[in-house]
Amino acid sequence: TEIYTLSLHDPLPIWKYLSAVLLFGVLSVSADKPYRLRVSVLDVGQGLSVVVQTPSHALVYDAGPSFSSGYDTGKSVVAPFLRSNGISMLDMLVVSHSDNDHAGGAAALVQRFHPLQLMVGEPVDLGSVAETEHCQRGMSWWWDGVQFSFLHPGHRQENSKNNRSCVLQIQYAGQSILLPGDIEAGVEQRLLE
């Protein structure tokens, strides 16, 4: 499994690292602790799963797909990555929206890692024991000097399930990472305004 990782120890220009990911397809800055912010994009095929770590917290943004054949990227890709990084419990699981390529593996993560918070952009079946909360623009929190903020959805009713995606902004040392789910051009434009 290919993993793209960005680890920040000190204030660094994140755009340089993100550009490298886009240009070269792989980035491994450093896996040594202590880091202030570590963002790992996991290869889950068509889909998305991002693991965000601070020194004392862990968040998973989307869990990739599951298939009728029984293959589940939450179980087969994300869970082993979390375990190999010493993560046995999640502070938060964010499921941007209900499309299988983002939400399919989430139930396996809920079962294995018992997230303290489950944030969703729209209703997602994560098992009978899972209580979810809808992400909303304006929700914000700090972990270990790193700020997390939901920028979308707001109170406006969106017609497309893609446009109901949770959009998460992560800020550290004056730099920003945006996890947009599957928002479309119209929502992107509104976020830029």
Locations of the language-model features?
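Short, exposed "boundary/linker" segments that immediately precede the start
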Residues: 1-6
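Non-globular, low-confidence helical/coil segments that flank catalytic cores
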Residues: 7-193
